[in-house]
Amino acid sequence: MSVMMGNDQEDALRNKLVAQLTYESDYQFAKAPDPPNVTAVVGDGQVTLYWDRSAENTADKYMGNITNGADLNDFEGYKVYRATDFEFNDAYTITDGDGNATFLEAYVQNGVKAQWDLIDGKSGWHPVDLNGIKFNLGDESGLVHSYVDNNVVNGQRYYYAVVSYDYGGDLTNNIIPSDSPMKLRVNSLTGVVTLGPNVVEVVPSPPSAGYVEASYSGDMVDHVSGSSSGEVFLEIIDPMIVKDAHTYQITFEDTSFLNQQGLAGYDTVTTKSYT
């Protein structure tokens, strides 16, 4: 016996069909990318978010199986959601053809959407719709791993979620893209909200009197060893982890090498994400 719920009878019956198909498929279905690990830094009228690249290496075995390995890694991009309540009701604004809230809308600041995707030829509206709506894959912006929100009010509580998403399937398999889950849990007795790795709760505020923010001398990083023709510029994203009067050394390692074995037809092969 099971209980099916929905916004109305039609929505509940649709959810029943999805549950039945999932059962008949032995719970084998496409997997959303893992959520990134997000850190928030609050400031005076400002919130900075930054996150790691762990989501970009997520393997989707189901997609890999049905595409003969072509879409084993179908990561596509990141989106930032912002709300003033932990249920993210502020962001649940995209409804399907029946008026049911279905997708969250990426946060928009000064007319610019907080969404970034790979430059891989996959952009715009995904061809497969979900009850009359389509998923926007992005506009070939390239990836970023930090974001600054300057449209905040000191003393106001905000919740941010950084989700990774994939590009799904196509019209041959009718698999739509999916976001990584926003993991949070509310204790019904105490009201305490437990946040997952990609959700943060912040209250921006001015710094305490006498606070001196982390800084560094010079405009560029001095090249001390190795072969390189590039220039490296610094930006301190999280001043709280920079220790006073310390000297830091930054090292880089190639993430790719020439593919002389003809692997998968590519001219480079990724070895590591970063060090």
Predicted feature residues:
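Extracellular/surface-associated beta-sandwich interaction domains
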Residues: 1-275
